[in-house]
């Protein structure tokens, strides 16, 4: 193994000089710097650029505090590798595969896998048309998820992306019963901590591996932590032949970290200050998240939308890789409708009669039509009032409002905030409920009875309590 010396440290960027008679490390190789002679404390660097004359520029995966010029840097000869296999379940890791959950550390001889890999070849890929039931009405009805598909949860700050992803973990991980991998990329440590203890209490943690590179970590760690989580998921798919659920919160932070790294490496920025390699980096990550003939990875990714602007290059680049999108809308949070999923902006390639069935498709398209017509009439209502509408339009508006409220429901993970029990609604019940609302069966019940309930039977019960 070749070794060099540190010649410059600029924040998370470390320049290392190797003598010209040695071979230089390959790009993406892991290099190690020991902070003291006992070799107890080390910093891992990743090769990013060759500057010429034997000098390479690296990105640190940890804080560079304590590094000095002249320190020895050892090339490991391979990329960062992380533990994989059944022993990772129930544990929490950082970007380097070190355990951070106060449990015992992994043995040195544990099976490990490199985080940089090629995506599966075209002939290995497999597609599925099986629906993944989430128990969340608005998703199951209007933008259903496919097993082995890729889903994006889009939304600005504070509209409920993380709560929605936690409810999906609660519902799918418990119902699905398979293996899950949760990757926290550049988000709040507090949320990760809450999620860990919640999963521990529910017992889901025994079938889940968790990987965190939170917002206080260097950009190198935030940029690579998604690959660490994906590597663990790929092993379960390819070697164990499992169907894996991969949750990533938040893909935007992966892009943001890449932007920071790109600037530190001296690359010319592209549109809106993003890295010129944005599409390439996103493609390298997303193309590995796929289903093969051996097993599947169903991924659910939260994607922050800066300033609620969907044309921003970061969410727009991620958009192209997804099978289904769940768009969260701030206007709905202002109306107190949770989850604040926009039923007209959200979409799914699975909403087709040959996949979901004729009745489901018919009810879903009718719901979209009613909501679209209601949106068009809102300007008239705001200016001239309800009296200017025809009798037919008044009935449509009345049903549209009931549909809109019925798309909301209480979450199990939000029970501590709302004081109301969460609900899991099977797809058949969801379709039945909306069909009966559209038929006018519940026109005599108050709109308020439809808000934040599960099944249609719960609406009737709530109406009785309200005195109807």
Swiss-Prot record:
PANTHER family (UniProt xref): ATP SYNTHASE, ATP SYNTHASE SUBUNIT BETA, MITOCHONDRIAL
EC number: 7.1.2.2
Function summary: Produces ATP from ADP in the presence of a proton gradient across the membrane. The catalytic sites are hosted primarily by the beta subunits.
Organism (species): Enterococcus hirae (strain ATCC 9790 / DSM 20160 / JCM 8729 / LMG 6399 / NBRC 3181 / NCIMB 6459 / NCDO 1258 / NCTC 12367 / WDCM 00089 / R)
Protein's name according to its UniProt entry: ATP synthase subunit beta
Complex and partners: F-type ATPases have 2 components, CF(1) - the catalytic core - and CF(0) - the membrane proton channel. CF(1) has five subunits: alpha(3), beta(3), gamma(1), delta(1), epsilon(1). CF(0) has three main subunits: a(1), b(2) and c(9-12). The alpha and beta chains form an alternating ring which encloses part of the gamma chain. CF(1) is attached to CF(0) by a central stalk formed by the gamma and epsilon chains, while a peripheral stalk is formed by the delta and b chains.
Binding site for ATP: 155-162
Membrane topology: Peripheral membrane protein
